[in-house]
Curated annotation (Swiss-Prot):
Gene Ontology annotations of biological process type: photorespiration; reductive pentose-phosphate cycle
Gene from which this protein is expressed: RBCS2
Alphabetical UniProt keywords: Calvin cycle, Carbon dioxide fixation, Chloroplast, Photorespiration, Photosynthesis, Plastid, Transit peptide
Subcellular location: Plastid, Chloroplast
Protein name (record): Ribulose bisphosphate carboxylase small subunit, chloroplastic 2
Length: 180
């Protein structure tokens, strides 16, 4: 039965008028042999969008004595009000604030792991426990001040931990020791 259905389907023909046959190209493989007009892509860099000739070259950061750390480290040091707004953003996203400090290396270095990436050999010490249930940025800033008093020569960062997804969502340096 199946062979008779298969053979009858193989000999079936479709009658088309010449106008219909020329309208649509036969489909072979993954691409049609005759399709829409192809647009030619210009790889010339001068054809890219322009700002009207007002190009200004930006200065690159010096490579010596300008270590960069994490998020927001390319900005000037944050004021207390700016830190409070960052912590408020963290709390509004339902992330758990936590403070961490590092007394030796607050920047990327390769001691335990040689490949670049997120896990770059830095291990920070947690200041107390994560602040579950914290609703006020002032609480976090008070803990930051306590940590600064205890470890004045340490780098201190604030992280935001999403307890639902169980990932760290934000991390930024809140305090750098003198000379950095």
């Amino acid at each position: 039965m199946a062979s008779s259905v298969l053979s009858s389907a193989a000999v079936a023909t479709v009658s088309r008028t010449p106008a219909q046959a020329s309208m649509v190209a036969p489909f072979t493989g993954l691409k049609s042999t005759v399709g829409f007009p192809a647009t030619k892509k210009n790889d010339d860099i001068t054809s890219l969008a322009s700002n009207g000739g007002r190009v200004q070259c930006m200065k690159v950061w010096p490579t010596q004595n300008m270590k960069r750390y994490e998020t927001l480290s390319y900005l000037p040091p944050l004021t207390t009000d700016q830190l409070a707004r960052q912590v408020d953003y963290l709390l509004n996203n339902k992330w758990v604030p936590c403070l961490e400090f590092e007394t030796d290396h607050g920047f990327v270095y390769r001691e335990h792991h040689n490949s670049p990436g997120y896990y770059d050999g830095r291990y920070w010490t947690m200041w107390k426990l994560p602040m579950f249930g914290c609703t006020d940025p002032a609480q976090v800033l008070n803990e930051l001040e306590e940590c600064k008093k205890e470890y004045p020569n340490a780098f201190i960062r604030i992280i935001g931990f999403d307890s639902n997804r169980q990932v760290q969502c934000v991390s930024f340096i809140a305090y750098k020791p003198a000379g950095y």
